Amino acid sequence: QELNTGGVKVSTETILDQHADLVIGYDTGVDRDALRKSGVKMYSTDAMCTDKKPPAPATFSQVKDEVTKVGQIFNVPDKANQVNKDLDAKISGIQKQATSGAKANAVALYITPGSTEFYTYGSSSMIEPMFATNGLQNMYHSNTTRVFDASMEDLLHKNPEWIVLLAGDGEMSKVEPTFLSFKGAKQLKAVKKGHVVTMSFALTDPPTPLTITGTEKLHDLIKDKK
Protein backbone atom coordinates (compact mmCIF):
# COMPACT_ATOMS: atom_id res chain seq x y z
CA GLN A 1 0.00 0.00 0.00
CA GLU A 2 1.29 3.45 -0.94
CA LEU A 3 0.79 6.35 1.44
CA ASN A 4 1.28 10.01 0.57
CA THR A 5 3.57 10.68 3.51
CA GLY A 6 7.26 10.51 4.33
CA GLY A 7 6.68 8.31 7.36
CA VAL A 8 3.97 6.71 9.42
CA LYS A 9 3.74 4.68 12.62
CA VAL A 10 2.49 1.15 11.96
CA SER A 11 1.37 -1.61 14.28
CA THR A 12 2.51 -5.23 14.37
CA GLU A 13 -0.94 -6.29 13.14
CA THR A 14 -0.72 -4.01 10.10
CA ILE A 15 2.67 -5.42 9.14
CA LEU A 16 1.43 -8.99 9.45
CA ASP A 17 -1.69 -8.16 7.41
CA GLN A 18 0.58 -6.90 4.62
CA HIS A 19 2.46 -10.25 4.63
CA ALA A 20 5.81 -8.47 4.79
CA ASP A 21 9.03 -10.47 4.59
CA LEU A 22 11.24 -7.68 5.91
CA VAL A 23 10.68 -4.51 7.92
CA ILE A 24 13.24 -1.70 7.73
CA GLY A 25 12.67 1.02 10.29
CA TYR A 26 12.31 1.59 14.01
CA ASP A 27 10.54 -0.30 16.78
CA THR A 28 7.85 2.27 17.58
CA GLY A 29 4.53 0.48 17.72
CA VAL A 30 6.06 -2.85 16.70
CA ASP A 31 6.52 -6.01 18.76
CA ARG A 32 9.81 -7.53 17.59
CA ASP A 33 9.12 -10.88 19.24
CA ALA A 34 5.75 -11.15 17.51
CA LEU A 35 7.35 -10.40 14.15
CA ARG A 36 10.09 -12.94 14.80
CA LYS A 37 7.56 -15.65 15.67
CA SER A 38 5.72 -14.91 12.43
CA GLY A 39 8.91 -15.21 10.40
CA VAL A 40 9.19 -11.50 9.61
CA LYS A 41 12.68 -10.07 9.83
CA MET A 42 13.33 -6.52 11.03
CA TYR A 43 16.29 -4.23 10.55
CA SER A 44 16.91 -0.93 12.35
CA THR A 45 19.91 1.32 11.79
CA ASP A 46 22.55 1.14 14.51
CA ALA A 47 21.89 4.78 15.42
CA MET A 48 18.33 3.92 16.44
CA CYS A 49 19.14 0.80 18.45
CA THR A 50 18.83 1.67 22.14
CA ASP A 51 21.25 -1.09 23.16
CA LYS A 52 24.10 0.46 21.14
CA LYS A 53 25.90 3.61 22.20
CA PRO A 54 26.47 5.84 19.16
CA PRO A 55 30.07 6.85 18.46
CA ALA A 56 31.08 10.37 19.37
CA PRO A 57 32.04 12.21 17.36
CA ALA A 58 29.82 10.86 14.61
CA THR A 59 31.45 10.38 11.20
CA PHE A 60 30.34 9.76 7.64
CA SER A 61 31.70 6.22 7.92
CA GLN A 62 28.44 5.43 9.73
CA VAL A 63 26.55 6.32 6.56
CA LYS A 64 28.71 4.00 4.49
CA ASP A 65 28.37 1.23 7.08
CA GLU A 66 24.58 1.39 6.74
CA VAL A 67 24.80 1.30 2.94
CA THR A 68 27.05 -1.76 3.18
CA LYS A 69 24.63 -3.53 5.52
CA VAL A 70 21.63 -2.85 3.30
CA GLY A 71 23.66 -4.12 0.34
CA GLN A 72 24.29 -7.34 2.25
CA ILE A 73 20.61 -7.70 3.19
CA PHE A 74 19.52 -7.48 -0.44
CA ASN A 75 22.58 -9.36 -1.75
CA VAL A 76 23.83 -6.45 -3.86
CA PRO A 77 27.28 -5.74 -2.32
CA ASP A 78 28.69 -4.39 -5.61
CA LYS A 79 25.88 -1.83 -5.82
CA ALA A 80 26.52 -0.80 -2.21
CA ASN A 81 30.23 -0.35 -2.94
CA GLN A 82 29.42 1.91 -5.89
CA VAL A 83 27.00 3.97 -3.80
CA ASN A 84 29.70 4.44 -1.17
CA LYS A 85 32.23 5.54 -3.80
CA ASP A 86 29.74 8.12 -5.07
CA LEU A 87 29.14 9.34 -1.50
CA ASP A 88 32.90 9.70 -0.93
CA ALA A 89 33.15 11.80 -4.08
CA LYS A 90 30.33 14.09 -2.94
CA ILE A 91 31.92 14.57 0.50
CA SER A 92 35.31 15.36 -1.04
CA GLY A 93 33.68 17.88 -3.37
CA ILE A 94 32.06 19.76 -0.48
CA GLN A 95 35.26 19.73 1.58
CA LYS A 96 37.21 21.30 -1.29
CA GLN A 97 34.69 24.13 -1.52
CA ALA A 98 34.54 24.80 2.23
CA THR A 99 36.28 27.90 3.52
CA SER A 100 39.77 27.14 4.82
CA GLY A 101 41.13 28.47 8.10
CA ALA A 102 39.31 28.81 11.42
CA LYS A 103 35.88 27.19 11.57
CA ALA A 104 32.86 29.40 12.27
CA ASN A 105 30.89 28.49 15.39
CA ALA A 106 27.43 27.03 14.76
CA VAL A 107 24.52 25.24 16.40
CA ALA A 108 21.64 23.17 15.03
CA LEU A 109 18.24 23.53 16.67
CA TYR A 110 15.09 21.46 16.22
CA ILE A 111 12.09 23.76 16.33
CA THR A 112 8.41 22.80 16.57
CA PRO A 113 6.13 25.64 15.40
CA GLY A 114 3.83 26.73 18.19
CA SER A 115 6.15 25.43 20.92
CA THR A 116 8.44 27.46 23.15
CA GLU A 117 10.83 24.54 23.62
CA PHE A 118 13.65 23.55 21.28
CA TYR A 119 16.46 21.00 21.10
CA THR A 120 20.06 20.96 19.99
CA TYR A 121 22.56 18.30 18.90
CA GLY A 122 25.79 16.95 20.38
CA SER A 123 28.78 15.20 18.87
CA SER A 124 27.06 11.82 18.35
CA SER A 125 24.61 13.44 15.93
CA MET A 126 25.32 13.53 12.20
CA ILE A 127 25.21 17.30 12.58
CA GLU A 128 28.82 16.95 13.77
CA PRO A 129 30.38 15.76 10.46
CA MET A 130 27.92 17.83 8.42
CA PHE A 131 29.16 20.98 10.16
CA ALA A 132 32.83 20.00 10.00
CA THR A 133 32.66 19.30 6.26
CA ASN A 134 31.16 22.74 5.70
CA GLY A 135 33.77 24.57 7.75
CA LEU A 136 31.61 24.92 10.88
CA GLN A 137 32.34 23.98 14.50
CA ASN A 138 29.45 22.54 16.53
CA MET A 139 29.34 24.58 19.73
CA TYR A 140 27.83 21.59 21.54
CA HIS A 141 30.67 19.30 20.45
CA SER A 142 31.63 18.58 24.08
CA ASN A 143 28.24 16.97 24.76
CA THR A 144 28.19 13.39 23.44
CA THR A 145 24.38 13.13 23.68
CA ARG A 146 22.75 13.02 20.24
CA VAL A 147 19.89 15.41 21.02
CA PHE A 148 18.95 17.27 24.19
CA ASP A 149 17.03 20.28 25.52
CA ALA A 150 18.46 23.70 24.75
CA SER A 151 17.75 27.09 26.31
CA MET A 152 17.85 30.64 25.03
CA GLU A 153 19.99 31.60 28.01
CA ASP A 154 22.72 29.16 26.99
CA LEU A 155 22.33 30.05 23.33
CA LEU A 156 22.85 33.74 24.12
CA HIS A 157 25.92 32.81 26.14
CA LYS A 158 27.42 30.82 23.25
CA ASN A 159 26.26 33.40 20.68
CA PRO A 160 26.93 31.30 17.52
CA GLU A 161 27.89 32.78 14.17
CA TRP A 162 25.55 30.39 12.35
CA ILE A 163 22.25 28.78 13.36
CA VAL A 164 20.74 25.86 11.45
CA LEU A 165 17.04 25.36 12.17
CA LEU A 166 15.67 21.85 11.65
CA ALA A 167 12.04 20.81 11.30
CA GLY A 168 9.62 18.41 9.67
CA ASP A 169 9.05 18.98 5.96
CA GLY A 170 5.53 20.34 6.46
CA GLU A 171 6.69 22.94 8.97
CA MET A 172 9.65 24.51 7.15
CA SER A 173 8.06 27.91 6.48
CA LYS A 174 6.98 28.33 10.11
CA VAL A 175 10.27 27.46 11.76
CA GLU A 176 12.23 30.70 11.47
CA PRO A 177 9.31 32.95 12.51
CA THR A 178 8.77 30.70 15.53
CA PHE A 179 12.43 30.89 16.49
CA LEU A 180 12.59 34.67 16.07
CA SER A 181 9.56 35.03 18.34
CA PHE A 182 11.54 33.55 21.25
CA LYS A 183 12.62 36.18 23.78
CA GLY A 184 16.25 37.12 23.16
CA ALA A 185 16.55 35.46 19.73
CA LYS A 186 17.02 38.74 17.86
CA GLN A 187 20.03 39.57 20.06
CA LEU A 188 21.99 36.62 18.68
CA LYS A 189 24.97 37.30 16.41
CA ALA A 190 23.73 34.82 13.79
CA VAL A 191 20.35 36.54 13.61
CA LYS A 192 21.87 40.02 13.31
CA LYS A 193 24.17 38.85 10.49
CA GLY A 194 21.42 36.98 8.65
CA HIS A 195 23.22 33.69 9.23
CA VAL A 196 20.11 31.63 10.02
CA VAL A 197 19.20 28.80 7.63
CA THR A 198 16.40 26.24 7.67
CA MET A 199 16.48 22.67 6.42
CA SER A 200 14.63 19.38 6.78
CA PHE A 201 15.54 17.23 9.76
CA ALA A 202 15.23 14.19 7.47
CA LEU A 203 18.51 15.29 5.85
CA THR A 204 20.46 14.82 9.09
CA ASP A 205 19.83 11.84 11.39
CA PRO A 206 19.96 8.86 11.28
CA PRO A 207 23.08 8.24 9.13
CA THR A 208 21.91 7.42 5.59
CA PRO A 209 22.76 8.75 2.10
CA LEU A 210 20.23 11.50 2.87
CA THR A 211 22.78 12.81 5.37
CA ILE A 212 25.17 13.48 2.50
CA THR A 213 22.37 15.16 0.57
CA GLY A 214 21.81 17.30 3.66
CA THR A 215 25.50 18.18 3.79
CA GLU A 216 25.31 19.40 0.18
CA LYS A 217 22.12 21.31 1.00
CA LEU A 218 23.78 22.97 3.99
CA HIS A 219 26.71 24.00 1.80
CA ASP A 220 24.34 25.71 -0.65
CA LEU A 221 22.37 27.43 2.13
CA ILE A 222 25.52 28.84 3.71
CA LYS A 223 26.89 29.94 0.35
CA ASP A 224 23.67 31.85 -0.42
CA LYS A 225 23.93 33.72 2.90
CA LYS A 226 27.53 34.87 2.48
Where are these regions (language model features)?
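Alpha-helical, coiled-coil/dimerization segments enriched in small aliphatic residues
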Residues: 2-5, 119-148
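Solvent-exposed loop/turn segments at secondary-structure junctions
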Residues: 22, 29-32, 48-51, 111-117, ...
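Structural recognition of the beta-strand scaffold that forms the well-ordered cores
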Residues: 22-25, 42-45, 105-110, 138-140, ...
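Short helices/loops that flank or line small-molecule/ion binding pockets
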Residues: 9-19, 33, 37-38, 150-159
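A short, structured surface patch at a secondary-structure boundary
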Residues: 1-18, 23, 139
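Basic- and aromatic-lined ligand-binding clefts that recognize polyanionic substrates
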Residues: 73-134
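Structured C-terminal subdomain patch of bacterial secreted/periplasmic proteins
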Residues: 58-74, 79-81, 158, 162-226
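Flexible loop/hinge segments that line or gate small-molecule binding clefts
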Residues: 32, 36-69
